[in-house]
From Swiss-Prot:
Record's protein name: Uncharacterized N-acetyltransferase MJ1530
Protein family per UniProt: Belongs to the acetyltransferase family.
UniProt-recorded Gene Ontology molecular function terms: protein-N-terminal amino-acid acetyltransferase activity
Stored Gene3D superfamilies: 3.40.630.30
Highest taxon of source: Archaea
One Pfam family hit: Acetyltransf_1
Cell compartments where the protein resides: Cytoplasm
Main location: cytoplasm
NCBIfam families tied to this protein: rimI
GO cellular component terms, semicolon-separated: NatA complex
UniProt xrefs under PANTHER family: N-TERMINAL ACETYLTRANSFERASE (PTHR23091), N-TERMINAL AMINO-ACID N(ALPHA)-ACETYLTRANSFERASE NATA (PTHR23091:SF4)
Source organism (scientific name): Methanocaldococcus jannaschii (strain ATCC 43067 / DSM 2661 / JAL-1 / JCM 10045 / NBRC 100440) (Methanococcus jannaschii)
Enzyme Commission number: 2.3.1.-
Length: 156
C-alpha cells in the first residue's frame, strides 16, 4: 500500500469511493475546492496502482479538520483507513503544528465512531440535525500530546 498526496488524476476514483461510502456524497466542486485551499490535507491510498481510499481535510483556526475519510468496501479491514488517518494526523500535529483535530460523524455510523475512538478521538458535542436528512452528528476531537491552549471551534 502506498499513501500519497491526491492529484487530479485521482478524482474519478475518489468520487466513486465517496458515492459508495456516503448517503449524501460531496459534490465534485466541494472536493476540488478543499483541495485547492488545502493541498497538503488530501491523501489517497493505492494498492497495485489503484486508488482504494482517501482522506480529505482542512484547517480552521489552527485546528486540523477531517472532512471525509473513506475506503472501498472490498478493502476495508486492511488498515487503509488507519494509514490514511495517521498520515493526515502527522501533517496536522508535526508539520502544521495544530493542537487539535476535529471531525463530525453521523450518530448512526457506529463503525466509524468505534474506529475514531480506537484512534484516540473523543466525543466533544452533539450537533443536532447537522446533516441534510436531519440526522444528528457528533463532533469528535483529538488533542496533540502535550498540547497547551484552548480548543477554538467557530463552526459549531
Amino acid at each position: 500500500m502506498i499513501i500519497r498526496k491526491f492529484s487530479s488524476k485521482d478524482l474519478d476514483a475518489v468520487e466513486e469511493i465517496e458515492r459508495e461510502a456516503f448517503k449524501t456524497p460531496y459534490p465534485t466542486s466541494l472536493i476540488l475546492g478543499f483541495w485547492s485551499m488545502y493541498p497538503n490535507c488530501f491523501y489517497v491510498a493505492e494498492i497495485d496502482g489503484r486508488v482504494v481510499g482517501y482522506i480529505l481535510g482542512s484547517m480552521d483556526w489552527g485546528n486540523g479538520h477531517i472532512i471525509s475519510l473513506a475506503v472501498k468496501k472490498e478493502c476495508r479491514g486492511l488498515g487503509i483507513g488507519t494509514a490514511l488517518l495517521k498520515t493526515l494526523e502527522n501533517y496536522y500535529f508535526n508539520i502544521a503544528n495544530c493542537n487539535y483535530i476535529v471531525l463530525e460523524v453521523r450518530v448512526s455510523n457506529v463503525l466509524a465512531r468505534r474506529f475514531y475512538y480506537r484512534m484516540g478521538y473523543r466525543d466533544r458535542k452533539l450537533l443536532p440535525k447537522y446533516y441534510e436528512d436531519g440526522e444528528d452528528a457528533i463532533l469528535m476531537i483529538k488533542k496533540k500530546p502535550n498540547a497547551k491552549g484552548p480548543l477554538i471551534i467557530t463552526l459549531w
